């Protein structure tokens, strides 16, 4: 009997990379690409051949209550609202902004409060890459940290801890509930969760662009991301059912434009990007 667990991307990767054999996961889904440190952990534990399969796309959605006024933010504004330290007059200071309008008079004149995913979540990692790091660069902070090299990106990802940024766990339903309780509050999650809660919440625009299926598929929406899963090559052919599962998961009836996964929010790959199990060898293998 298949065993399915919800762990978040980071937690899933730890379990996946813990070893080979029936006591360890065969497959892990991920809302971000596997990290170098995770590849090294896999190698350390004998997981030496990992196949990556991109199954579709998703768009992070920054949402708020239907009762709220429409809002539009760019990456720089979001970084300045959420970062632990921000550049002011050429110097870094602890984030002083309490209202959005203090960042830009065109923004809402109410408190900054954003519900975010936990650090172990692939959604949080995608948000930090697509919003915090890009916003950090636009604000000039990244260049000011240039002597740190790659560590500059880590600095860009650090969120403030004064109550303006609130970790809300992996429970998207709870985030939706909290958004409906306060029209000044924002929170983010995957596009599919917006679709099933359109009677309660609405999206903000990012740099003037609202999340749509088309915008996510062609990546014109600024915070679109790929979704993928990872499978242990060593388990294919030795663990019953894996080949059949892969054939089904990558079939057009599942992940195609009219597939049943699109009915629950998956944004299908374009025809040029579409894959099937018979073409797995053309995809990235980490060894």
Where in the sequence are the language-model features?
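Flexible loop/hinge segments at secondary-structure junctions
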Residues: 1-281
């Amino acid at each position: 009997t298949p065993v399915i667990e919800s762990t978040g991307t980071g937690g899933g990767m730890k379990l996946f990379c813990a070893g080979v054999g029936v006591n360890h996961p065969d497959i892990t889904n991920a809302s971000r690409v596997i990290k170098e440190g995770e590849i090294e952990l896999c190698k350390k534990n004998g997981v030496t051949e990992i196949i990556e399969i991109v199954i579709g796309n998703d768009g992070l959605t920054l949402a708020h209550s239907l009762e709220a006024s429409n809002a539009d933010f760019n990456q720089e504004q979001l970084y300045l609202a959420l970062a632990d330290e921000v550049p002011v007059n050429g110097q870094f200071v602890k984030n002083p902004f309490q209202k959005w309008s203090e960042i830009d008079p065109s923004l809402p004149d109410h408190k900054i409060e954003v519900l975010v995913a936990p650090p172990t979540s692939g959604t949080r990692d995608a948000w930090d890459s697509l919003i915090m790091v890009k916003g950090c660069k636009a604000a000039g902070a990244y260049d000011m940290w240039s002597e740190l090299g790659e560590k500059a990106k880590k600095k860009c990802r650090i969120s403030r801890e004064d109550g303006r940024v609130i970790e809300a766990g992996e429970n998207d339903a709870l985030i939706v509930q909290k958004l409906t309780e306060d029209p000044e509050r924002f929170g983010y999650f995957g596009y599919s969760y917006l679709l099933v809660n359109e009677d309660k919440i609405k999206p903000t625009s990012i740099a003037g662009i609202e999340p749509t299926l088309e915008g996510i598929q062609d990546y014109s929406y600024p915070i679109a991301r790929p979704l993928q899963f990872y499978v242990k090559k060593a388990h294919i052919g030795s663990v019953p059912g894996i080949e059949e599962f892969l054939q089904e998961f990558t079939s057009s009836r599942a992940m195609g434009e009219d597939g049943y996964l699109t009915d629950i929010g998956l944004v299908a790959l374009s025809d040029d990007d579409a894959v099937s199990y018979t073409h797995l060898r053309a995809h990235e293998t980490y060894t």
